[in-house]
């Protein structure tokens, strides 16, 4: 167990995909991981898995869009070393002309307001740690657009701006802000959720792409960035599969 063992890393959206993989990565790096998500059964199962592997983990059911719940949660921690803002997601792929405003609102609430809520609530504890790290998991959608992605792109652009502005505002404090922006990542739920459970549409997203990123690939990236020396700030790390050159340029094998 490393010197990080007594230090706390909080991961939002830890019930599956990148969040769960990041929890495993940070636990292996020696952090005491705090798993948060709405699906309590999932994070409790992950906490059990981590305990059985010899790691320190605890699960908290939390909806990041519920500010009162977030504030109550934050009172449990005097010092936090790492916050990974992973909770988020996409809904729908309709053009702007016909997009569902409810989807846009929900994506903004989860990706942006959720990140804002948790970051604001835990910033005092991150500062108190003496060398806190805020990770914002954005997306390449936060750095370029694509047809049918308006709502998600808008939310992720806002999340990118949140990270960039926070870094400017807290410079000189013992907290760094790291933005990790993944491209095409194939997880069990992202595309399936985006298309309302339509497995055929979800699979088409990755059709012909030999090796899209995995949740573990992104988790490795986050863990690497977090474990740099405290004076080193990875402002922005964009990670894509080799087959993807941009949001709209992807090599697909026939």
PLM segments and residue spans:
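Conserved glycine-rich cofactor-binding loop
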Residues: 15-16
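Residue(s) in the substrate-gating loop at a strand-loop-helix junction
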Residues: 139
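The beta1-alpha1 cofactor-binding region of Rossmann-like NAD(H)/NADP(H)-dependent oxidoreductases
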Residues: 40, 60-72, 101
